[in-house]
Amino acid sequence: MLRANGRGLRELRPVTIERHYLKYAEGSALITVGDTRVICSATVEEKVPPFLKNTGKGWITAEYSLLPRSTKERTIREVTRGRLTGRTQEIQRLIGRSLRSVVDMSLLGERTIWLDCDVLQADGGTRTAAITGSFVALAEALAGLVAAGGVPAMPLKDFLAAVSVGLVDDELILDLDFQEDSHAGVDMNVVMTGSGQLVEVQGTAEGRPFTREQLTAMLDLAGEGIESLIAIQKQVLGDIASRVGTGNDK
């Protein structure tokens, strides 16, 4: 099959991550994946939800939203609707629990870090881009806390990124854009750590089931894509990258 811009079946779209994108946030990044663009910002609050009070542990949570014209047809703001859609709630929870999986909450202390993910333009893979970009914003915020003496050591235990894989016309492909996603027989989102551990796998067949062998092949391809995404994260984070997984502030 032919893909947009002539990319290969096992090839990511062009990916860039720009740090310090917002002036006031403790951490921020603009991630661009092909024509998908998401601003991810990290905000540190010196408090935790009630269920974590007096535990000495922190919390990571997320919000996600689409700008009205991030999509081909105008998307009504959810504040106007007066409620979050099920899709938005699902994505917010996915981002939050994915990031929590690589943070030592006892090192974070009793504080909350909010990750706000605002989609400027949606062309497939917004949730996976939000996770990949949010990791960079979170790392930036945590490095600032360590530098200020707010936390004793770097709480990040590992890198984290996410990507989509799928079957389109019986071809296994990496990083689906909107058009490919719309025609996919199988669409799967995979979240994985730098050490290759799985955090989340969301896979759905459309029309007919897929085999265990195809599942394994999709996970292997996702692993290749995530390895490339983490290499970009490391390059963008510079010195901060060397402190991820060390549990110290050296």
Curated annotation (Swiss-Prot):
Q: What is its EC number?
A: 2.7.7.56
Read off the PROSITE patterns from this record.
Answer: RIBONUCLEASE_PH
Pfam families of this UniProt entry?
A: RNase_PH, RNase_PH_C
Q: Which InterPro entries does the UniProt record give? A: ExoRNase_PH_dom1, ExoRNase_PH_dom2, ExoRNase_PH_dom2_sf, PNPase/RNase_PH_dom_sf, Ribosomal_Su5_D2-typ_SF, RNase_PH, RNase_PH_bac-type, RNase_PH_CS
What GO molecular function annotation could you give as one example from this UniProt entry? tRNA binding
EC top class named in words: transferase
**GO BP terms:** rRNA catabolic process; rRNA processing; tRNA processing
Q: In which domain of life is the source organism classified?
A: Bacteria
Q: Which residues bind phosphate?
A: R87, G125, T126, R127
Which CDD domains does the entry link to?
A: RNase_PH_bact
Q: Which reaction does it catalyse?
A: tRNA(n+1) + phosphate = tRNA(n) + a ribonucleoside 5'-diphosphate
Keywords assigned by UniProt, alphabetized = Nucleotidyltransferase, RNA-binding, rRNA processing, Transferase, tRNA processing, tRNA-binding
Q: What does this protein do?
A: Phosphorolytic 3'-5' exoribonuclease that plays an important role in tRNA 3'-end maturation. Removes nucleotide residues following the 3'-CCA terminus of tRNAs; can also add nucleotides to the ends of RNA molecules by using nucleoside diphosphates as substrates, but this may not be physiologically important. Probably plays a role in initiation of 16S rRNA degradation (leading to ribosome degradation) during starvation.
Q: How does it assemble?
A: Homohexameric ring arranged as a trimer of dimers.
Q: Which family does it belong to?
A: Belongs to the RNase PH family.
| Protein's name in the database | Ribonuclease PH
Species whose genome carries this gene: Moorella thermoacetica (strain ATCC 39073 / JCM 9320)
